[in-house]
Amino acid sequence: MNHLRFLHYVDEVARTGSVRQASERLHVAPSAVLRRIQDIEDELGTAIFERLPRGMRLTAAGELFIHYVRTSSADLERVRSEIEDLQGLRRGSVRLVVSQALAPTFLPKVVASFRERHTLVGFQIRVTDHVQALSALRNFDTDLALIFNLADESDLERIVELEQRLCVIMHRDHPLAKVPGPLKLRDCADYPLVMPNREIGGRQLLDRFLSRRSFRLQPVVECNSFEFLRGYLQYEQALSFQISVGAVNDGGPFASRDIEDRSFPKGKLALAALRGRQLPVIAYSFIEHLKLELERAAVEHGT
């Protein structure tokens, strides 16, 4: 299927905006990339790239063509998956973008348990925010997105949604870890707070609630990495916040407590795909597995 390989040349130039960078990623000569682009433009009878002093940019016709390229590539992966399914191989790859809150604990367990039954299946997972998740879905860079507070978009199909509370996270030696039951946000005001950046969905949920309250929570550290925030809790008697599916009460170094403030809002964790897109067979199997794990998590955390 050399023609699909040559279409991949075009896709790489579109992504990088540079023939040189695309050729380096493809491990071919720049002249080979340019030759294939010229062949396609001759066949279409129009330019698909503008040649700029500092790179290449898709024309309007190029935007249409690149959508065809990416759709064709995704369809080929689906057909390969279906053929392998007919042969009983159950192999292939699942591509997934996820909110950062899911990366440390929840998702590794889900993927590992799926691979116990499907050892030939690989995963390509990218941690991202909801804006980049939308882009990845629309550009066929991913099969699925598992994102907290995903924006409503007409071209997305929400396969499953799960309500999520915000929890307080602390080291197990923290004084509040010895307090049984839920906490009020005012209980947190007496301790240093290490919080996600304002671009993180859980932080936005918290800020909206506090904007209607008479007290404020002032973080001493803000970071867009949950790994860093958890790591920091080992060195100071500080508190952080996390959605319930990412909370930990497994006897490890961290503990979590629910927030019991009246009218405290919940967000939604959504598993989504591009509406109308046919996914690889193995992706549908993973969806069913993920649904069960999300339902189990909802029962465990009482959401």
Feature-to-residue mapping (PLM):
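Secondary-structure junction motif
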Residues: 183, 192-213, 279-288, 294-302
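A short LG(V/I)-centered, amphipathic sequence patch enriched
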Residues: 15, 41-58, 63
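Hydrophobic hinge/microswitch elements
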Residues: 129-134, 138-142, 147-148, 201-257
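Short helix-boundary/capping micro-motifs
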Residues: 11-29
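Flexible hinge/capping segments at coil-to-helix
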Residues: 156-166, 170-193
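Conserved amphipathic alpha-helical core elements
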Residues: 40-41, 114
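Central regulatory/effector-binding core of bacterial HTH transcription factors
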Residues: 91-154, 223
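A late-sequence structural motif
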Residues: 106, 257-300
